[in-house]
């Protein structure tokens, strides 16, 4: 017994020092971070999200889930330079060629992170994604991201879409707490085979609890409202068809047009913030240089106005709390400079956007969003337009196929403007199509593309003699003549005394749902489920012998 005991004690003495000296990562558990507030932007106009600090920046929860028109691409002013990310508040730097893991405990959502966030224009980062891909991800985080050489990298994890969707559904005033684990090591382990930084022989592992409170939700509403504006050579605007909230207005010595361009709702928990700024910016640099600051102005109430001049004038988050709209004023000189620069037939979504700047977060505090409403700006001399009679950019219909089912009908308003009536007006329908038995049909497809179903389609309008003219128009991209439509004429007189006229008519695009050919696919198979299609209607006008 004594011998056995002695042997056991000797073995223990030999093994214990080896265990005590085994190398491991250095684990540091930081004190809980102070709770931070964030503002969430739900952009229904552009179908993306943005999150930004309501107060202090660190710990970080900041940035958009999609690039906007402000994305930096290697030249010009640096605005948006990464997508959204989180950190533990210490903004810890990473070592070149080391590997990095980040994972969350008590994560509010499964698969919260996509990889290592970096600044897109820094050396070693991806200009397109601002992301360094890891070897693998799981429900808690990502693992095995190699820190590239070049510009600085930090312990930042890029947020997944699932994380943004969680933030979207959080009630204002609610909070979540998660434990952020961040680990880097020089050991070249294989994360795709299950190895992890925390299990390596050396490295640094940091653990910290962070809490974020949703202090506000800004919802940008896409109203799909649409209006036409015709401008003469002196920039004087004339409102055409549409339902956007526009009116002629004079501000000081400038006359022009003002329109409600953004609709929003803003819910808060009482947050006070002045670092968040919102203002419009002209996308066309030549136009921005040609107009004066007061030729484009913006307002939260339509009565008190601020000029547009880069970042000099803005409304703060606190000011936005007392409103639900943003109005924009365009002076006649604004439109005149458009004419001088040859900018015509343009959609306001392509002309300017609104910018969102949070001065607290310079790297990820820039964001851009489109207007809720759309203006179609056209020259009054020799122009043609077509808009939905619902005054929306993307009219849609749905229905059922079978005997007695109603057609899908779309109504449009066609407008021409010139010194005289147009000599010729043509119209055509484009979209997925296939010829069957010598006739062109619009083709609707299932989401998986396996079912392709033919539908006939027609264009019809009332002629001058009161008859209905109908064309077979199966999305075939062929022009049809509608010059003999019944046009309603309104004369106009230019500021120079020159006269002209604006002519309007209506046209209907119809897709029957009760045609027997639509009961089978283009391959002559039966089908069941849902199919869809999208297309466009184009018009063109010609004036001849105009002096």
Swiss-Prot record:
Signal sequence annotation: 1-20
Function: Part of the ecpRABCDE operon, which encodes the E.coli common pilus (ECP). ECP is found in both commensal and pathogenic strains and plays a dual role in early-stage biofilm development and host cell recognition. Tip pilus adhesin, which is required for assembly of EcpA into fibers.
Summary of subunit composition and partner proteins: Forms polymers. Interacts with EcpA.
Organism: Escherichia coli O6:H1 (strain CFT073 / ATCC 700928 / UPEC)
Keyword Signal assigned: yes
Family of this protein: Belongs to the EcpD/MatE family.
Inducing stimuli: Negatively regulated by H-NS. Positively regulated by IHF and EcpR.
Subcellular compartments: Fimbrium
Source organism superkingdom: Bacteria
Subcellular location, principal: other
GO cellular component, as recorded: pilus
Descriptive protein name: Fimbria adhesin EcpD
Keywords: Fimbrium, Signal
């Amino acid at each position: 017994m004594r011998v056995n005991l002695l042997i056991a004690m000797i073995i223990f003495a030999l093994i214990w020092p080896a265990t005590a000296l085994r190398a491991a990562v250095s684990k540091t558990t930081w004190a809980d971070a102070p709770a931070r507030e964030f503002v969430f932007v739900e952009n229904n106009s552009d179908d993306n999200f943005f999150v930004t600090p309501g107060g202090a920046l660190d710990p970080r929860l900041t940035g958009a889930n999609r690039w906007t028109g402000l994305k930096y691409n290697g030249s010009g002013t640096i605005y948006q330079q990464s997508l959204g990310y989180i950190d533990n508040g210490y903004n810890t730097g990473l070592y070149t060629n080391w590997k990095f893991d980040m994972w969350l405990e008590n994560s509010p959502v499964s698969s919260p992170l996509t990889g290592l966030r970096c600044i897109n224009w820094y050396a070693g980062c991806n200009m397109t994604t601002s992301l360094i891909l890891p070897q693998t991800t799981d429900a808690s985080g990502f693992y095995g991201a190699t820190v590239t050489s070049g510009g600085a990298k930090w312990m930042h994890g890029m947020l997944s879409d699932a994380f943004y969707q969680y933030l979207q559904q959080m009630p204002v005033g609610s909070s979540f707490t998660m434990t952020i684990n961040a680990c880097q090591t020089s050991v070249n382990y294989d994360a795709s085979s299950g190895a992890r930084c925390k299990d390596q022989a050396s490295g640094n592992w940091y653990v910290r609890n962070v809490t974020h409170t949703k202090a506000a939700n800004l919802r940008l509403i896409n109203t799909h409202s649409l209006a036409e504006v015709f401008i003469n050579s002196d920039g004087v605007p004339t409102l055409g068809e549409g339902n956007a909230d526009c009116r002629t207005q004079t501000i000081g010595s400038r006359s022009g047009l003002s329109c409600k361009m953004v609709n929003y709702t803003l819910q808060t928990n009482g947050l006070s913030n002045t670092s968040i700024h919102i203002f419009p910016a002209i996308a066309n640099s030549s136009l921005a240089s040609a107009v004066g600051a007061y030729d484009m102005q913006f307002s939260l109430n339509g009565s008190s106005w601020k000029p547009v001049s880069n970042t000099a004038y803005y409304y703060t988050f606190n000011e936005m709390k007392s409103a639900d709209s943003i109005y924009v004023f365009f002076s006649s000189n604004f439109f005149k400079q458009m004419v001088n620069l040859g900018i015509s037939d343009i959609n306001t979504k392509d002309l300017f956007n609104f910018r969102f700047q949070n001065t607290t977060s310079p790297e990820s505090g820039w964001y851009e969003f489109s207007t809720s409403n759309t203006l179609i700006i056209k020259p009054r001399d020799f122009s043609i337009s077509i808009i939905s009679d619902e005054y929306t950019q993307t009219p849609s219909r749905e229905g059922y196929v079978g005997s007695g089912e109603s057609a899908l009908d779309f109504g449009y308003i066609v407008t021409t403007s010139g010194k005289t009536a147009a000599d010729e007006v043509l119209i055509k329908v484009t979209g997925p199509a296939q010829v069957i038995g010598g006739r062109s049909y619009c083709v609707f497809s299932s989401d998986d593309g396996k079912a392709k179903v033919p539908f006939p389609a027609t264009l019809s309008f009332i002629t001058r003699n009161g008859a209905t003219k109908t064309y077979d128009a199966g999305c075939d991209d062929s022009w049809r003549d509608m010059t003999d439509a019944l046009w309603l004429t309104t004369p106009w007189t230019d500021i120079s005394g020159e006269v002209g006229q604006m002519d309007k008519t209506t046209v209907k695009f119809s897709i029957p749902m009760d045609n027997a050919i639509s009961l089978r696919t283009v391959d002559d198979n039966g089908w069941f489920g849902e199919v869809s299609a999208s297309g466009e209607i184009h018009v063109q006008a010609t004036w001849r012998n105009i002096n």
